[in-house]
UniProtKB/Swiss-Prot annotation:
It holds the Pfam family HlyD_D23. It is found in: Cell inner membrane. It is a single-pass membrane protein. It comes from the Bacteria. Keywords: Cell inner membrane, Cell membrane, Membrane, Transmembrane, Transmembrane helix, Transport. NCBIfam families: PRK10559.1, RND_mfp. Its main location: membrane. This is p-hydroxybenzoic acid efflux pump subunit AaeA. Forms an efflux pump with AaeB. Induction: Positively coregulated with aaeB and aaeX by AaeR. One of its GO terms (biological process) is transmembrane transport. The chain crosses the membrane at residues 12-32.
């Protein structure tokens, strides 16, 4: 009798353990397959393409590639003597027209005071018209001077914000044209993550939900918050022909590939360019609250690691 009870107890314990293991594995599998996550995520940042507003020879480069710079710091300088001479010429024109305008103003005033008793109306009108023409030329010269001053100021290229200089491709002695990108500036404290979630997982993604970000090749888990979900993506299977008619690509009805939708995630703490913009990461959206790692089972931890490595 005791032997029978012992065998029954062992069998019952084995069955219970198998059931518990199955439940744990099933929960881990659900966690792995159904909760919102993706390995297709990238660190991003606000990038400013810096281009000069004037053309000329580069006379001085004050920074080096990948340097952290402050807002207003000089990056490089373009040929200033040429623009200084242009400003001096414009200032001379302004001075000339100021003197000429004063003379014509006095002449017109004198003729207006004398009136038609001393001269004809035509002569009076002519003096007034000459004055207006000179005043117009003076205003034009002043505008040219202001533009020359602005051009001279813009020969000094400064950093528009704190950030890292990257892809610096200007050197002393080179000629640079107006509007050509000289350097990119990655803004400091502007890093975020773009996670490309499958449309089937968007039900569990909402602005304000918490997220975990694991950079590729790192065991460190960063925390963040879902900032926004893209309002639309391009329909790659539909185009228009030259007559404006819709062209729909053929596909297999039983094979439907889920579209990926960009989800922007705001990082809790900026990482000071430890993971540069463009590097990849794994993102898991944990819901309204952070995941309690102390409550994770062994199988769930395994599932979490599987997400990171494939």
């Amino acid at each position: 009798m005791k032997t029978l009870i012992r065998k029954f107890s062992r069998t019952a314990i084995t069955v219970v353990l198998v059931i518990l293991a199955f439940i744990a594995i099933f929960n881990a599998w659900v966690y792995y397959t159904e909760s919102p996550w993706t390995r297709d995520a990238r660190f991003s940042a606000d990038v400013v393409a810096i281009a000069p507003d004037v053309s000329g020879l580069i006379t001085q480069v004050n920074v080096h590639d990948n340097q952290l710079v402050k807002k207003g710091q000089i990056l490089f300088t373009i040929d200033q003597p040429r623009y200084q001479k242009a400003l001096e010429e414009a200032q001379a024109d302004v001075a000339y027209y100021q003197v000429l305008a004063q003379e014509k103003r006095q002449e017109a005033g004198r003729r207006n005071r004398l009136g038609v008793q001393a001269m004809s109306r035509e002569e009076i009108d002519q003096a007034n018209n000459v004055l207006q023409t000179v005043l117009h030329q003076l205003a034009k010269a002043q505008a040219t001077r202001d533009l020359a001053k602005l051009d001279l100021e813009r020969t000094v290229i400064r950093a528009p914000a704190d950030g890292w200089v990257t892809n610096l491709n200007v050197y002393t002695g080179e000629f640079i044209t107006r509007g050509s990108t000289a350097v990119a500036l990655v803004k400091q404290n502007s890093f975020y993550v773009l996670a490309y979630m499958e449309e089937t997982k968007l039900e569990g993604v909402r602005p304000g939900y918490r997220a975990e970000i694991t950079p590729l090749g790192s065991n460190k888990v960063l925390k963040g918050t879902v900032d926004s979900v893209a309002a639309g993506v391009t329909n790659a299977s539909s185009t228009r022909d030259d007559k404006g008619m819709a062209t729909i690509d053929s596909n297999l009805e039983w094979v439907r590939l889920a579209q990926r939708v960009p989800v922007r995630i705001r990082l809790d703490n900026q990482q000071e360019n430890i993971w540069p913009a463009g590097t990849t990461a794994t993102v898991v959206v944990t819901g309204k609250q952070d995941r309690d790692e102390s409550q994770d089972s062994f199988f769930r931890k395994m599932a979490h690691r599987l997400r990171e490595f494939g």
